[in-house]
């Protein structure tokens, strides 16, 4: 039985899906104006692991993660680069996909983009105005926070506490607002900005409305799980709840999940502090699986400190697991012992996806395997556990198989069947085996 720590209730709750055997998840994706750093990647990896565990236990998962391709930061970066916002966002969407693929993140069921939902966003805003939850002011449209009952329920604070703690993350206070916490649903266009026509003039969506529209358009008025980084709890997720529930009159999400930060010297990794390393740069020297494994060593809600030693340890531990998988199979293994490992792994992951405890079970099982208990069922169970963490090792070609293929190639060459000989060379090359034809015969090496 899976239990989830729900930010809304500040408690562990048994997971009960809206539809049996199906999980509908929406996870806030990146604002695509630059390469993602390790801290950004944690959210992608954490929720991918959660998705994978749901699938491990038999659920079908509809996993939606958006790309914010309309934003002040994108407009600014595009202007500086001398390209259009779409060109810039396309470039960094491609980079995000490449980086997360290297981290073993599965493709989302859908990756909606804001630019594709402008008509739906305008319709959503019109509905809020009709219900008196929003008001137009000189081409801008704001959400009326004081009309929203229990506005701060996710943050578990009063309105006055939120005002003090917003730290510049709410819209800049203007004379047009009825309340400093009122937030923009639609922003009037400035000269030269990307914009769309609307009932309030040319403009573009506010940040928060985008996720509400894409989530409800794809998954419906109520979804099972909404996730994102802990920094999104307020104002982003707070505002998503307010506007979504104002429009539909229904609970927006049944479970709210937030991942912790990656820290450097115990301080949050962020672009503003300048203490970040991009995934793109890290992948030049560190294997993506190593980064992934490092991010899995702590339970998703806890902070994780980024150090060279932590990355080195992750690399060493991955090599150990890979070597374990390559052990020769044995004829027997204690079936009850195997069952206990599987139960222990599920107990760990059922407890709010506790990857740290899950990994402990994996290493205990590896020690057992290396003591001489490695049948085909054991190997299958072990590989499935590793796959939950996105760790999948490609099967290495055995030396005996390489030698057999080389002999077959030599025979083909002797028979002047060069097409077959070349095909075998290509087959081995695709598996990382390079052939060297010398006067003393054929030598081979792993590329």
Swiss-Prot record:
User: What's the Enzyme Commission number for this chain?
Assistant: 6.1.1.16
Q: Name one GO biological process term.
A: cysteinyl-tRNA aminoacylation
Keyword Transferase listed? The answer is: no
Residues holding Zn(2+): 28, 211, 236, 240
Q: Which GO terms describe its cellular component?
A: cytosol
Q: MF terms per GO, please?
A: ATP binding; cysteine-tRNA ligase activity; zinc ion binding
Q: Does the keyword Ribosomal protein apply?
A: no
Cofactor binding mode and count: Binds 1 zinc ion per subunit.
Q: List the disulfide bonds.
A: none
Provide the residue positions that the database annotates as binding ATP: 271
Q: Where is this motif: 'HIGH' region?
A: 30-40
List, alphabetically, the CDD domains matched: CysRS_core
Report the transmembrane regions from the record: none
Known SMART domains for this protein?
A: DALR_2 (SM00840)
Q: One Pfam family for this entry, by name?
A: DALR_2
What NCBIfam families is this protein classified in?
A: cysS
Q: Which family does it belong to?
A: Belongs to the class-I aminoacyl-tRNA synthetase family.
Q: HAMAP family given for it?
A: Cys_tRNA_synth
Whom does it interact with, and what assembly results? Answer: Monomer.
What is the designated name of this protein?
Cysteine--tRNA ligase
Q: Which organism is it from?
A: Streptococcus pyogenes serotype M6 (strain ATCC BAA-946 / MGAS10394)
């Amino acid at each position: 039985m899976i239990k989830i720590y729900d930010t809304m209730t500040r408690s562990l709750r048994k997971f009960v899906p809206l539809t049996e055997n199906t999980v509908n998840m929406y996870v806030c994706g990146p604002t695509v104006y630059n390469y993602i750093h390790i801290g950004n990647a944690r959210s992608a990896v954490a929720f991918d692991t959660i998705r994978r565990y749901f699938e491990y236990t038999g659920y079908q998962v509809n996993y939606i993660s958006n790309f914010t391709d309309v934003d002040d930061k994108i407009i600014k970066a595009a202007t500086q680069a001398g390209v259009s916002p779409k060109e810039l966002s396309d470039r960094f969407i491609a980079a995000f996909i490449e980086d997360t693929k290297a981290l073993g993140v599965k493709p989302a069921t859908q990756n909606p983009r804001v630019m594709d939902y402008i008509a739906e966003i305008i319709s959503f805003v019109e509905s809020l105005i009709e219900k008196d939850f929003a008001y137009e002011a000189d081409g801008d449209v704001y959400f009326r926070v004081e009309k929203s009952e229990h506005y701060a329920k996710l943050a578990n604070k009063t309105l006055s506490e939120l005002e003090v703690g917003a730290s510049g993350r709410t819209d800049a206070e203007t004379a047009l607002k009825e309340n400093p916490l009122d937030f923009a649903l639609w922003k009037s266009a400035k000269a030269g900005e990307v914009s769309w026509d609307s009932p309030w003039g040319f403009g573009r969506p506010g940040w928060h409305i985008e996720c509400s529209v894409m989530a409800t358009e794809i998954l419906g008025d109520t979804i099972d799980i909404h996730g994102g980084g802990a920094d999104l709890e307020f104002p982003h997720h707070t505002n998503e709840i307010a506007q979504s529930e104002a429009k539909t009159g229904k609970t927006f999400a049944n479970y709210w999940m937030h991942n912790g930060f990656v820290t450097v010297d115990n301080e949050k990794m962020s672009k503003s502090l300048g203490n970040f390393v991009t995934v793109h740069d890290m992948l030049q020297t560190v294997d993506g699986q190593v980064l992934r494994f490092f991010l899995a060593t702590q339970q998703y809600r806890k902070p994780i400190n980024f150090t060279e030693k932590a990355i080195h340890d992750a690399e060493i531990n991955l090599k150990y697991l890979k070597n374990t998988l390559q052990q020769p199979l044995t004829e027997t293994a204690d079936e009850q012992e195997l069952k206990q490992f599987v139960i222990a792994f599920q107990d760990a992951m059922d407890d709010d996806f506790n990857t740290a405890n899950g990994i402990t079970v994996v290493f205990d099982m590896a020690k057992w395997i290396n003591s001489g208990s490695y049948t085909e069922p054991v190997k299958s169970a072990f590989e499935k556990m590793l796959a939950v963490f996105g760790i999948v090792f490609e099967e290495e070609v055995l030396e005996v198989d390489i030698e057999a293929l080389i002999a077959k190639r030599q025979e083909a060459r002797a028979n002047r069947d060069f097409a077959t000989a070349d095909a075998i060379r290509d087959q081995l090359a695709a598996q990382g085996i390079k052939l060297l034809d010398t006067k003393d015969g054929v030598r081979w090496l792993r590329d």
